[in-house]
């Protein structure tokens, strides 16, 4: 068996990617494929925590465009992450991997409330943990939730899964075919150049806590497994100058 590069990670999954080709809702085939990779990583002995977005159902800024109050729109997105988390939990548990969903907003009939020590204990017991409902507050993205949870559980890295984009570019490669890809970039460069890795709050949180970010295309064949093993799938590493 190959030796994984990380012992404990936060895997940030794009919500939009869960919709597959439909572009909205959930694609069972995508869920199953992701669950199989998560199981493979789990079976290597890696402690896996997951944060999933909600772009397949809702985006807060969409609500703003409709004239909604920003906080209300963000709360809707927060609830959508819970739907995604439950769907992913079901897919993973069908592969006989114990999985816990922990929410930042209490909904005890649905999932456990997030308690830091309990989350770490679940990971130590070999369970996959899915963090849902963002940070529990409006105005914060699921990227910020991933950075916050990674700091709280002392994860060795955030594996930032993107849909159809290999790593970090100086501009959107889906729009600009001359976009230049970075193999490695610092937190400071991400902030100064406004590179679309994660929002500034999340990037600053990772920088302050020295949490490396690995940006990769989560839809490539076995890319999650390969990234955990340290194999090259075209990913970009975001870290400090001395990391």
Swiss-Prot record:
Transmembrane segments: none annotated. ATP binds at residues 12-15, 55, 59, 163, 169, 172. Pathway: Pyrimidine metabolism; CTP biosynthesis via de novo pathway; UDP from UMP (UMPK route): step 1/1. It comes from the Bacteria. It holds the Pfam family AA_kinase. It is found in: Cytoplasm. It catalyses: UMP + ATP = UDP + ADP. UMP binds at residues 74, 135-142. GO terms for cellular component: cytoplasm. CDD domains: AAK_UMPK-PyrH-Ec. Keywords: Allosteric enzyme, ATP-binding, Cytoplasm, Kinase, Nucleotide-binding, Pyrimidine biosynthesis, Transferase. The keyword Transferase applies. Residues 20-25 are annotated as: Involved in allosteric activation by GTP. Allosterically activated by GTP. Inhibited by UTP. Homohexamer. Catalyzes the reversible phosphorylation of UMP to UDP. Belongs to the UMP kinase family. This is Uridylate kinase. It comes from Symbiobacterium thermophilum (strain DSM 24528 / JCM 14929 / IAM 14863 / T). The gene is pyrH.
């Amino acid at each position: 068996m190959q030796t994984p590069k990380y012992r404990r990670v936060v895997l940030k999954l794009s919500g939009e990617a869960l919709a597959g080709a439909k572009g909205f809702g959930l694609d069972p085939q995508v869920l199953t494929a992701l669950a199989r990779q998560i199981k493979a990583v789990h079976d290597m002995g890696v402690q896996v925590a997951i944060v999933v977005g909600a772009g397949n159902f809702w985006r807060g800024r969409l609500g703003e465009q409709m004239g909604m109050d920003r906080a209300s729109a963000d709360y809707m997105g927060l609830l959508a992450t819970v739907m995604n988390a439950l769907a992913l939990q079901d897919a993973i548990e069908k592969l006989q991997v114990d999985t816990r969903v922990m929410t930042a907003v209490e909904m005890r009939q649905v999932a456990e409330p997030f308690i830091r020590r309990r989350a770490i204990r679940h990971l130590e017991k070999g369970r996959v943990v899915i963090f849902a409902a963002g940070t529990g507050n409006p105005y914060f993205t699921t990227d910020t939730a991933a950075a916050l949870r990674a700091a709280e559980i002392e994860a060795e890295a955030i594996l930032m899964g993107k849909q159809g984009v290999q790593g970090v570019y100086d501009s959107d490669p889906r729009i600009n075919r001359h976009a230049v890809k970075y193999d490695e970039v610092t937190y400071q460069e991400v902030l100064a150049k406004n590179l679309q890795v994660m929002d500034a709050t999340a990037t600053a949180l990772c920088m302050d806590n020295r949490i490396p970010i690995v940006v990769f295309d989560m839809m490539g064949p076995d890319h999650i497994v390969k990234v955990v093993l340290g194999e090259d799938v075209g990913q970009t590493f975001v870290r400090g100058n001395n990391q």
